[in-house]
C-alpha cells in the first residue's frame, strides 16, 4: 500500500503539471482545482464519485479559503486524519432528494390484463411495483441553494437508474420512459420530459446526467425519441406544440457541435461522433483517469486521453474495446489506447437519423411545413450517408467507421444493428436487410449465449465487453430484427426476447434484484467489470423486460 503522505505528494505534483487542462465545469470545487485534486488523489473515499456528491456547507469562496488555510496550517504535511477532518468540517453527506410516490402509479396497469402466461404476468407486476422505489424528487433546499450542491436541480419527480446512480441520466431514461408508459404512468413521463426540456433551455443540451460535473458531455441523443413514445401514448399535441422548439434546440446541439467530415471513395460525408473537448479528468472518476493517463509524460497526450475518456462516457459505453484502437486498427490494448474521437459510431448516426424523422413528423402534424421539410431533408442525407459509410455489403451489417484509417471496424458489437432499430434505410429494403442482419448474427455464434447477447467478443475486463449483456443492447437487436420485415429475423427476435425475459426472471427469483447488466454465460447472473461494482434497481432493465413482454407475451 502506498503511504498516505506519498499519495499526497503525488497528488500535488500531478496537479502542478495538469493545471492547464480544460475543466469539466466552472465549479472550482466539484470540477477543477487543487481541492478536488488533493481529495480525489488521496483516496480517502473508495469511490471517486462520493466526494463530488457531497454538499458544501459554506459557499464556494469560503470553502476554497478554508482549504488554503488548511494547506498553510498543515504545511503540506497533512495526514489522512487531517484531510478527512477538513472534508467533514466543510462538506456534508446529505440526501438531496425527498420521498416521492408518483401520483399516477398503479400496481395493476392495463398491460397485465393482456398477458396470458401467469408467471410472466406476475413478473411484470413485480417489475411495475419497483417504480416507486426508484422515484425521486429534489428537495426544496437544493432548489433554493443549488450552489451548495453538484446536483442539477429540476422541478418534477423522476425515476433513477438505481444503486450509485442517484440522479437521472440521459439515455437510461429512454427505456425507463418506455417502461413507465407501459405501466400507464403518463404524468410521470411528462414530468421527466419537462425536466429534460428545462435543462436544454438552461444549457442548450442535455448532459450525461444531472450533475454539474457532467456538463462537459452529453449521452446518446434520445430525447426526441422519448417525446415520440410519449406523444404516441397520449396524443398530447398541446404539450408538443408548447415544447417543439426546445426539442429542436437539443438536436441542433449535435448538428452544431458533433459533426465531422468523413471521406470514403473520394466523397465527403458529414456524420456525427462522440466528442467531448474537455481535456481534464472526469471528477466522478478522477483518480481512475489520472492513473490511466499516468503512462504518458506529455501533458498534451494526457489531455487527449481525457477527451477520449469523456467522449467514450458520452457514448454511454464507458468503457469498451469498441473505443480502443491499436496500431493496426484492432482492439488490442487498455484504456490508455482509447481513441473514441477517431471513430464514427453507427448507433449515434442511426439515433440522430430517426430523431430527425420524428421531429419532421412533429412539425408536419403541427402545420409547420418549412421546418418539417428541413428535417426531412436531413433524414435523406443521413440515410444515404449511413448506407454509404457504415454499411458493409459483404458482411450484411453496419459497422463503426475508423476515420483515420478510413475503414470499417469489423468487430461484433450490438450497435451494429442500430440502423435496423432506428429504421434508417429505404423501407423497400427492410426485408432483405433484416435477413442479412439475422444471418450475420447467427454466423457470429450469438445463439450460443443463453444469458443474453454479449456487448462484444473481447475479454478486456471492461464492463461494455464480454461477458456482459446490457439491456439496451438487447432492445436494439431484438426490436430491430422484429421491425425489419424478415420472417427469419422476426422469429430470431422472438427467441432472443424469450431468452432474455427468462434469464432476468431467473436472476430475480434468485436474488430479488434486477441488475444493470448480466452475464451471458450464466442466465440471471449479474455482470461485472469496470470501475464500480454491479448496481441493482434497475431502471432500464425493468423497461426493456416490460418492452419485450408487451411485444412478445401479450394477446
UniProtKB/Swiss-Prot annotation:
Any single GO BP term: trehalose catabolic process
EC id: 3.2.1.28
Induction description: It is increased from 1 to 2 days after adult ecdysis, but decreased after 4 days. It is dependent on ecdysteroid hormone during pupal stage.
Hydrolase recorded as keyword: yes
GO annotation, cellular component aspect: extracellular region
Sugar-modified residues: 46, 216, 334, 371
Binding positions (substrate): 164, 171-172, 208, 217-219, 282-284, 316, 531
Keywords for the protein's UniProt record, in alphabetical order: Glycoprotein, Glycosidase, Hydrolase, Secreted, Signal
Tissue and organ distribution: Bean-shaped accessory glands (bags).
Leader sequence residues: 1-16
Localization in the cell: Secreted
Top EC group: hydrolase
Entries under Pfam families matching the protein: Trehalase (PF01204)
Active site: 318 (proton donor/acceptor), 516 (proton donor/acceptor)
Gene Ontology MF term list: alpha,alpha-trehalase activity
Keyword Secreted tagged: yes
The reaction(s) this protein catalyses: alpha,alpha-trehalose + H2O = alpha-D-glucose + beta-D-glucose
InterPro entries: 6-hairpin_glycosidase_sf, 6hp_glycosidase-like_sf, Glyco_hydro_37, Glyco_hydro_37_CS
Name assigned to this protein: Trehalase
Organism name: Tenebrio molitor (Yellow mealworm beetle)
